[in-house]
Every structure is written in C-alpha cells, then in structure tokens.
Amino acid sequence: MCGWGREFETLNLNDYRINFYGQTLDGDRFDDVVAKMRQADIVVMGSPVYWHNICASVRTLMERFYGTIPEGEFKGKRLFFIYQGAAPTKMMIDDGEYSMSRFAKMYGFSYEGMATSRAEAKKLREKMTIK
C-alpha cells in the first residue's frame, strides 16, 4: 500500500514476455497483464521517451490489444500516463499523448492525463484521490 491510502501492484512489462502483434509463440504473458489491468480500478502506465516515442514494451502491449480486446472493454477504469525523458521535444510529448489518449478512447478507459515532470505527476496524483 502506498503512503496515501491506495493499494497497488507494479508490473514491469520487461518481466513479462509479450509477443509482437501476430506472433503465436509459446510463453506469451499478454493475457496475464490484461487480467491484472482488468482487476484494477486505476491503471497507471509509464514509459521512458525512447527513440522519440513510447518504449517498445508499452507499445507492444498497446498493439496487442488491437483485434484481441473488444473496444470499450475497460469502461469505468481510469488511465493515467507517466512519460519521462531527458529532454523530450513538444512533438515527442504530443505524440505520446495522442497515442495514449487514442488507446484509452478505443478501450473505454477514462483518460485522466499525462505527466512529463514531477509537478505534473503531483497533479495527477491529486486527481487519483478525487474520485
């Protein structure tokens, strides 16, 4: 449990084998990650800015949703996005925001926003305690 009253579980996607879209290799754990997301009221996704965009592990998870998870499946769940890099440009931030907000819309999440700095993360944290 975190210091402000919410229990949470952290999943590091690098610890889960998630096959690329279209692959059917043994050991895929996509369903395990999705099951954890279904159990949560709030999903906080985080990614470093990597090669000007969302990192491969998060991007692969998002891509695997397509055609597998019904649109609107996560209706009622809240999604927050933490996106951090050494010196992201406005274009990089805008692209990450677009990708995550579009993902949220397709799958029914209430997209609560993105944080790219400590100050923005604090504002998102406050939003988590409001509802």
State what each model feature region is.
Residues M1-T68, K105-M106, Y111-K131:
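N-terminal beta1-alpha1-beta2 submodule of the flavodoxin-like/Rossmannoid cofactor-binding fold
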Residues I69-F74:
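Mid-chain, well-packed structural core segment of small domains
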Residues K75-M114:
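Short, glycine-/small-residue-rich phosphate/pyrophosphate-handling segment
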